From Swiss-Prot:
Organism, scientific name: Rattus norvegicus (Rat)
Protein name: Low-density lipoprotein receptor
PROSITE patterns found in the cross-reference section: ASX_HYDROXYL, EGF_2, EGF_3, EGF_CA, LDLRA_1, LDLRA_2, LDLRB
Residue ranges annotated for the LDL-receptor class A domain, each copy included: 25-65, 66-106, 107-145, 146-186, 196-234, 235-273, 275-314
Gene: Ldlr
Region (Clustered O-linked oligosaccharides): 717-788
Annotated compartments: Cell membrane; Membrane, Clathrin-coated pit; Golgi apparatus; Early endosome
Residues modified as Phosphothreonine: T717, T724, T732, T733
Length: 879
């Protein structure tokens, strides 16, 4: 390539770069330009959340010019934010200047409200509903005994449950009275226990087999004598199913799909897309007419083109010859024939039938789906039993209850609404929440105090709690507990970090940090070693990574705007999250496939904040509605109001032993305590059968030694600042202490999305020569830090340099481009002149070109995710 060509290419590249810079200087019609040049949607300006990285969309100068819409209240003052009118005089200060709580008239209850003894108002429909909606319980005082309907069973505690749930081996009443022997027939039950070889959770068939009790009356005969399907109630279909005229059920999506899925073809009756020629007694002529089927092959012309009287087809039964080529059913028609398939099969090529795998549809079963030839079977995981009436997998054991925050307290509500109490009162600004079921312990974060607390539940009046994380916290919006390994994980949206600590708060470490990210809610899967969190930064996304901070990448990057709460349904292996701007609840499997929108509703999902999954229900909190709702987690149907007037409900979790299954703590299963790690032992993601069970980690500012277990101080570090973090500098080590990284083969999965780049800040990425045990255990406060003042000065200088740099480029860049073009023209002229000079060249036969040999530079095909030196082997510990 000549010098002139090279210079021309440089000139073109600079011109394109200049055009790109100019394009970024302006935003669209419905966009707002941040001070740093970024464009956001105009309706996000002054909405209470910072979408601009520099916060200019929420600055006082910007918000002073905002005009509130109808149904909103203007705070006025220095920051004129808009809040819903419903927040006005609600007893909670929402405006920075407190104007929403000024000049409020004394609280009076309306005619449709009940006044509690403490002065608060609740809806009259909550009175005597067996639920304490007043904190003092006055709404449940002097109530008459509850009367249950004829199809319900009355518990000893006066609550009502469906009669089908009584004596089914599963405690549905909170006091277990639905399973008491005196209510189930003590003599008969005792006799059955003695003579029956089946357990209490099994059904004894008349043909002597034992089957699961939940299989009784499920529509499929499992006993040889079919005794499990005798004396059953009339079959009813699920809300997402269509009931055929013969009583059978098909998935609702198969109704009116132009295919007969019901045996009686009732699923295609009454459909809008049915034409006048559709149906078994209609025939459509080739010329367009529609005639009745009895006029076909009657030796009379009823179609203009005689297509109703073909000579060869009339009175010919094609099914007599090799069944017409049909694999199952051949139906002879007056003209031609058609192949049919039995229930549970579908026609694939006009002749062959194949089994329909109903289990490919995620909504087919509540939990487990077993595909059978021509049918399927729904089953439940351990700890659940299927309800024969609703086909829902119900948890075994005590009744579950919801725990949720409402800024100043943590409340507890049982799912049957028999108990509704204030669990932890008198809090400042509680947001994030999670539990440790086995130890009956609860954890929460307080944004005002900037601390993470822990307490034992149900302490009664003598409530006490501890601050386990009390330093280097800014906005701990998300919290999750690893109940197997005894760790807690939290997000901090200010520095954009995800951190981990033991449940005592003694050891902690930052696992993830990304400039511009805004991690919000987090959920963990300690059984498989993964964590997931929502990020409402730019771009918004959902991230996935190992619990030890490795293999982090973006799982969801499309059709997502403001992801808030996230939860994991372990039995189904699906993630659920709410999007506050899309007003939706969505789900996806843990590998990023099978995405589905469960529900979209601007009223009931006005501003969803958090959600929880239990059995077949999804529960979510809504800040604007000040309420908790529930719906079917598979279909989004059956939306119900669980609680209201909650004063900013935020995080919500479901407390039940089935939500936290037991697992192996490999850090404690080895001979060496703490897995042989000097500081922290963190579970590793189980990507394959060869993945390590755990890896060691060091506090921020320290590195793993060569033994990959002990910790050493970082050397030759260069502190840098990132964002507005004051937790500590992001440090880079010199080549002398760097560890060679292998290429991650899975990184190609996210080439289209820059945010999908995997991050690994595990200190195991570096090592130095040091003997284990030389360095004592260190806390995070001993790591290298940079003061807030120094970081602010550095950030200010950076902004100033950037402003001067932009002005300098605007002057220098055009001059440089013109100079390059002139220089390129001179080179082209000289090149043209040299070509016009005649010359004679003599090739030297001795000189041979030696640069034609190809040089191949190979790199390892192994992934970097788990270097061999990081793996901790149990056999090594035993040795």
């Amino acid at each position: 390539m000549s010098t002139a060509d090279l210079m021309l290419r440089w000139a073109i590249a600079l011109l394109l770069a200049a055009a790109g810079v100019a394009a970024e200087d302006s935003c669209g019609k419905n966009e707002f330009q941040c001070r740093d040049g970024k464009c956001i949607v105009s309706k996000w300006v002054c909405d209470g959340s910072r979408e601009c990285p520099d916060g200019s969309d929420e600055s006082p100068e910007t918000c002073m010019s905002v005009t509130c819409r109808s149904g909103e209240f203007s705070c006025g003052g220095r920051v004129s934010r808009c809040i819903p009118d419903s927040w006005r005089c609600d007893g909670r200060t929402d405006c920075e200047n407190g104007s929403d709580e000024l000049d409020c008239s004394p609280k009076t209850c309306s005619l449709d409200e009940f006044r509690c003894q403490d002065g608060k108002c609740i809806s009259r429909q909550f009175v005597c509903d067996q639920d304490w909606d007043c904190l003092d319980g006055s709404d449940e005082a002097h109530c008459a005994a509850t009367t249950c309907g004829p199809a319900h069973f009355r518990c000893n505690s006066s609550s009502c449950i469906p009669s089908l749930w009584a004596c089914d081996g599963d405690r549905d009443c909170d006091d277990g009275s639905d399973e008491w022997p005196q209510n189930c027939g003590a003599e008969d039950t005792a006799a059955e226990v003695v003579s029956s070889p089946c357990s209490s959770l099994e059904f004894h068939c008349g043909s002597s087999e034992c089957i699961h009790r939940s299989w009784v009356c499920d529509g499929a005969a499992d006993c040889k004598d079919k005794s499990d399907e005798e004396n059953c109630a009339v079959t009813t279909c699920r809300p997402d199913e269509f009931q055929c005229a013969d009583g059978s059920c098909i998935h609702g999506s198969r109704q009116c799909d132009r295919e007969h899925d019901c045996k009686d073809m009732s699923d295609e009756l009454g459909c809008i897309n049915v034409t006048q020629c559709d149906g078994p007694n209609k025939f459509k002529c080739h010329s367009g007419e529609c005639i009745s089927l009895d006029k076909v092959c009657n030796s009379a012309r009823d179609c203009r083109d005689w297509s109703d009287e073909p000579i060869k087809e009339c009175k010919t039964n094609e099914c007599l010859d090799n069944n017409g080529g049909c694999s199952h059913i051949c139906k002879d028609l007056k003209i031609g024939y058609e192949c049919l398939c039995p229930s549970g099969f579908r026609l694939v090529d006009g002749h062959q039938c194949e089994d329909i795998d109903e289990c490919q549809e995620p909504d087919t079963c509540s939990q487990l789906c077993v595909n059978l030839e021509g049918s399927f079977k729904c089953e439940c995981r351990a700890g659940f039993h299927m309800d024969p009436h609703t086909r829902v997998c119900k948890a075994v054991g005590s009744i579950g209850f919801l725990l949720f925050t409402n800024r100043h307290e943590v409340r507890k509500m049982t799912l049957d609404r028999s108990e509704y109490t204030s669990l932890i009162p008198n809090l400042k600004n509680v947001v994030a929440l999670d539990t440790e079921v086995a130890n009956n312990r609860i954890y929460w974060s307080d944004l005002s105090q900037r601390k993470i607390y822990s307490a034992v539940m149900d302490q009664g009046t003598s409530l006490s709690y501890d601050a386990i994380i009390s330093g280097d916290l800014h906005a701990p919006d998300g919290l999750a507990v690893d109940w197997i390994h005894g760790n807690i994980y939290w997000t901090d949206s200010v520095p954009g970090t995800v951190s981990v600590a033991d449940t005592k708060g003694v050891r902690r470490r930052t696992l993830f940090r990304e400039k511009g990210s805004r991690p919000r809610a987090i959920v963990v899967d300690p059984v498989h070693g993964f964590m997931y969190w929502t990020d409402w930064g730019t771009p918004a996304k959902i991230k996935k990574g190992g619990l030890n901070g490795v293999d982090i990448y973006s799982l969801v990057t499309e059709d997502i705007q403001w992801p808030n709460g996230i939860t994991l349904d372990l039995p189904s292996g699906r993630l659920y999250w709410v999007d506050s701007k899309l007003h939706s609840i969505s789900s996806i499997d843990v590998n990023g496939g099978g995405r589905k929108t469960i529900l979209e509703d601007e009223k009931q999902l006005a501003h969803p904040f958090s959600l929880a999954i239990y059995e077949d229900k999804v529960y979510w909190t809504d800040v604007l509605n000040e309420a908790i709702f529930s719906a079917n987690r598979l279909t989004g149907s059956d939306v119900n109001l669980v609680a209201k007037n909650l004063m900013s409900p935020e995080d919500i979790v479901l407390f039940h032993n089935v939500t936290q299954p037991r697992g192996v703590n490999w850090c404690e299963a080895t001979v060496l305590p703490n897995g042989g790690c000097q500081y922290m032992c963190l579970p590793a993601p189980q990507i394959s059968a060869h993945s390590p069970k755990f890896t060691c980690a060091c506090p921020d500012g320290m590195l793993l030694a060569k033994d990959m277990r002990s910790c050493l101080p970082e050397v030759d570090t260069v502190p840098t600042t990132q964002g507005t973090s004051t937790i500590g500098p992001v440090v880079t080590t010199s080549a002398a202490v760097s560890l060679k990284r292998k290429e991650d083969p899975s990184a190609t999965r996210h080439k289209e999305d820059p945010s999908a780049t995997r991050h690994n800040e595990d200190p195991s990425a570096t090592s130095t020569s040091r003997q284990p045990g030389d360095t004592p255990e260190l806390s995070t406060v001993e790591s290298v830090t940079v003061s807030s003042q120094v970081q602010g000065d550095m950030a200010g200088r950076g902004d100033e340099v950037q402003r001067h740099g932009v002005g300098f480029l605007s002057i220098f860049l055009p001059i440089a481009l013109v100079a390059l073009l002139v220089f390129g023209a001179i080179l082209l002229w000289r090149n043209w002149r040299l070509r016009n000079i005649n010359s004679i060249n003599f090739d030297n036969p001795v000189y041979q070109k030696t640069t034609e040999d190809e040089i191949h530079i190979c790199r390892s095909q192994d992934g970097y995710t788990y270097p061999s030196r990081q793996m901790v082997s149990l056999e090594d510990d035993v040795a």
